[in-house]
Amino acid sequence: MAKKALIEKSNRKPKYAVRGYTRCQRCGRSRSVYRGFGLCRVCLRQMAHRGELPGVTKSSW
């Protein structure tokens, strides 16, 4: 889990647009966040395995 201060800091509008970054909506992780889902890879994988994300299926070949 991210520190509450870092989550609050990311919610503020940055002074310059390029300073903005995404955080996982579920756990607050700042790295490897999928924009389409708003989730990090860890949360995305957990939710996909439990079937909580409609249309996401496990790939097999």
UniProtKB/Swiss-Prot annotation:
This is Small ribosomal subunit protein uS14. Its cofactor is Zn(2+). The keyword Ribonucleoprotein applies. The lineage of its organism: Bacteria, Bacillati, Actinomycetota, Actinomycetes, Frankiales. Part of the 30S ribosomal subunit. Contacts proteins S3 and S10. Keywords: Metal-binding, Ribonucleoprotein, Ribosomal protein, RNA-binding, rRNA-binding, Zinc. PROSITE patterns: RIBOSOMAL_S14. The gene is rpsZ. It comes from the Bacteria. Binds 16S rRNA, required for the assembly of 30S particles and may also be responsible for determining the conformation of the 16S rRNA at the A site. One of its GO terms (biological process) is translation. GO terms for molecular function: rRNA binding; structural constituent of ribosome; zinc ion binding. Binds 1 zinc ion per subunit. One of its GO terms (cellular component) is small ribosomal subunit. Belongs to the universal ribosomal protein uS14 family. Zinc-binding uS14 subfamily. InterPro entries: Ribosomal_uS14, Ribosomal_uS14_bact, Ribosomal_uS14_CS, Ribosomal_uS14_sf. Signal peptide: none annotated. Zn(2+) binds at residues 24, 27, 40, 43. Pfam families: Ribosomal_S14 (PF00253). Gene3D superfamilies: 30s Ribosomal Protein S14, Chain N.
